[in-house]
């Protein structure tokens, strides 16, 4: 069961990470009462010409830098899935590990969500396309421009995580009240 992380700060910040071996998207949001406030987003570019170890280190170092810039209390990444290419899934798993290490080093709780769950929470459709995720991101945050779909995906992961944390906190309060 997830709990809201304890933080001295009034408004909790969460980071969503969309891992990839070439581009890893990230987005930081903050609860603002009943609303969600966009804080920042970007892409960690590992490049496609470096060897595997160099790419993983690049992802790790860039995410460390991002995490240090914000007051992140909790993080979420997308679960890996195997579609048709098991080797691609393995590589994605390695990129996910770099993201988890960056969060873990900073003592940030990491949650994982299936891609269809993220899409369902964010767009209302579990099989939403990348374009539909980007459109929903622009509707929810009209003043934010994303240079790549990886940023919008990371935002969707962060929003999904924030909603899940709030839902679990409300359920825990209701259970305690009922006992």
Regions found by a protein language model. Name each.
Residues 1-179:
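Phosphate- and other anionic-substrate recognition elements at nucleic-acid/protein interfaces
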């Amino acid at each position: 069961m997830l709990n809201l992380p304890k933080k001295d700060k009034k408004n909790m910040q969460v980071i969503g990470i969309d891992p990839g071996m070439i581009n890893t998207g990230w987005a930081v949001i903050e609860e603002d009462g009943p609303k969600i406030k966009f804080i920042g987003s970007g892409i960690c570019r590992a490049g496609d010409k470096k060897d595997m170890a160099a790419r993983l280190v690049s992802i790790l170092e860039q995410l460390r830098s991002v995490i240090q810039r914000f007051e992140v209390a909790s993080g979420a990444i997308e679960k890996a899935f195997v579609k048709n290419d098991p080797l691609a899934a393995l590589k994605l798993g390695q990129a996910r590990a770099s993201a988890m290490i960056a969060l873990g080093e900073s003592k940030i709780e990491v949650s994982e969500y299936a891609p269809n769950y993220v899409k369902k929470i964010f767009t209302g459709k579990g099989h939403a396309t990348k374009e539909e995720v980007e459109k929903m991101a622009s509707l929810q945050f009209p003043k934010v421009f994303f240079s790549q779909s990886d940023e919008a995906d990371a935002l969707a992961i962060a929003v999904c995580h924030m909603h899940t944390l709030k839902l679990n906190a409300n359920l825990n309060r209701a259970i305690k009240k009922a006992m």
